Amino acid sequence: MSSIDPKQFGKVAVLLGGNSAEREVSLNSGRLVLQGLRDAGVDAHPFDPAERPLAALKEEGFVRAFNALHGGYGENGQIQGALDFYGIKYTGSGVLGSALGLDKFRTKLVWQQLGIPTPPFEAVLRGDDYEARSKEIVAKLGLPLFVKPASEGSSVAVIKVKSADALPAALIEAVKYDKIVVVEKSVEGGGEYTACIAGNLDLPVIRIVPAGEFYDYHAKYIANDTQYLIPCGLAADEEARLKVLARRAFDVLGCTDWGRADFMLDADGNPYFLEVNTAPGMTDHSLPPKAARAVGISYQELVVGVLALTLQD
């Protein structure tokens, strides 16, 4: 990556913490981002919106923000709208891309309309008859299924359901986190992958092999036995094709600059996109630093490069 004068950035806030279910992940990400930026000579400071009003950013002379918030208002367009209002440049997607990207239900609706392959699904609303909906969904989609709150990240409250009897309880648990729940047909046979996006960098696809049944919160941030395969094992031309498709899945939602697109392959190698992440984790377990490191880009270079994307607007 080309050398960047850290003075170009001015005073930078690293947004971290927040009040979503992913607060601890965000704190971990933010601390590492902060250290990486400071090591590069950037005038960076921590800022937790759960503890201080956003107006303080403008009052204290911040001109730029690295968004290390995860979930909730940090990813759903609210923080982005406030930063736009205060005239502060920020990393990641804008209001529309952030709002759509966090909402798995509406993401899948857009993808369906535009021909991006995504697993068959049904939506369940808080207050529905969970027993009746469970019977309808199993009859339509079969088993196994994944139950996901529409607007939580880091696999918070994601439940794999293998029997029809277990689905109502999974729905009852998921609606505690969101009023809309996505019930998605499980894609089996070809593995789970992610394509990391950071400007024009050509980052490798990563295959994720969790020790447990799927890549849940524990596998993402706690376990040390999750395998991340780089190279991912796909033929070079197939990997290149999937990176192009991942970029399209990201772009059609209005997402910009950097993030991730996660997908599964079935037994025949057909891809099914699950979600995008517009503010990916940046912990020592997280995927973008792993992808960057595989092509010789250090953590410090990555965070400075992501921040540098705010200079292009």
UniProtKB/Swiss-Prot annotation:
Residues 108-308 form the ATP-grasp domain. GO terms for biological process: cell wall organization; peptidoglycan biosynthetic process; regulation of cell shape. Belongs to the D-alanine--D-alanine ligase family. The gene is ddl. Keywords: ATP-binding, Cell shape, Cell wall biogenesis/degradation, Cytoplasm, Ligase, Magnesium, Manganese, Metal-binding, Nucleotide-binding, Peptidoglycan synthesis. PROSITE patterns: ATP_GRASP, DALA_DALA_LIGASE_1, DALA_DALA_LIGASE_2. Mg(2+) 1 binds at residues 262, 275. It holds the Pfam family Dala_Dala_lig_C. GO terms for cellular component: cytosol. This is D-alanine--D-alanine ligase. Its cofactor is Mg(2+); Mn(2+). Gene3D superfamilies: 3.40.50.20, ATP-grasp fold, A domain, ATP-grasp fold, B domain. InterPro entries: ATP-grasp, ATP_grasp_subdomain_1, D-Ala_lig_Van_CS, D_ala_D_ala, Dala_Dala_lig_C, Dala_Dala_lig_N, PreATP-grasp_dom_sf.
